[in-house]
Amino acid sequence: MTFTLNHFDLDAFIDATLAEDLGDKGDITSAAVIPAEARFTGVMDSREAIVVAGLPLAEAFFRTLDPDVVVERLVGEGDKAEVGSDLLRVSGRARALLTAERSALNIVQHLSGIATLTRRYVDAIEGTGAILLDTRKTIPGLRVLEKYATRMGGAQNHRMGLWDAAMIKDNHVAVAGSVGEAVQRAVAAGIERIIVEVDRLDQIHPALEAGATHLLLDNMDAPMLREAVGLVAGRVPTEASGGVTLETIRAKAETGVTYISVGRITQSAPAADIGLDFESA
């Protein structure tokens, strides 16, 4: 299996997750109850309609504990799966499969939950031309995986961290003294991608004049967003952000903004209802 993500050590993640579960004694239940030579076949299935994400990670958990395991992925990453759909079939040593079961399920449930909610937001703005972005509102240590899940749901990734673009927010402006001064300092530092958060229309011109390359229009209602987009006049991409819900996102998308960023797709996504049942091989 090949599954790689930039800025993410998959092996370290798998090892740390299993170590958390196994402690110093290992899976004492499976060791006591399951014969060492026993073999199982299991099927992971969806108990609700979902968008799938994370099956390669489930495979990695099983393969770490049983290098000879046979894994068959029955759907693709980013695919829609209806209620009762089989997602993955796994056959191997029973003890290893039972030991890895919870870790494999946890990550697929979590990432598929994010992908599923993301797809709902993407579908809500279909046809408007606006693009859904995720945010840095992620669980510490899981950002790369959660942003992978939003891509499977149809969103695009915003900044991966503080290192890949400048984002000048209200607290930066408060210290710098003004929007224009904050942007000028970022330009002077040689930063090429400068995102500037504005929450008033009178901040737009100073931000653009100073060298902003992207404007984040924060907590603006649809009429104000439309006016802001008109003032920007296509000079840089625009992004609506702040308090966006499934009920409000389409009206904001129809104002002509380039992007809409939504923290809820990672911060508030419920785990997908996915199960895994085993039987003797």
Predicted segments, located by residue:
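Acidic/glycine-rich phosphate/pyrophosphate-binding loops and surrounding catalytic core
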Residues: 2-210, 223-231, 237-239, 246, ...
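Active-site loop ensemble at the mouth of alpha/beta enzyme cores that anchors a bound cofactor
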Residues: 275-281
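A Lys-centered signature of the CheY-like receiver
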Residues: 218
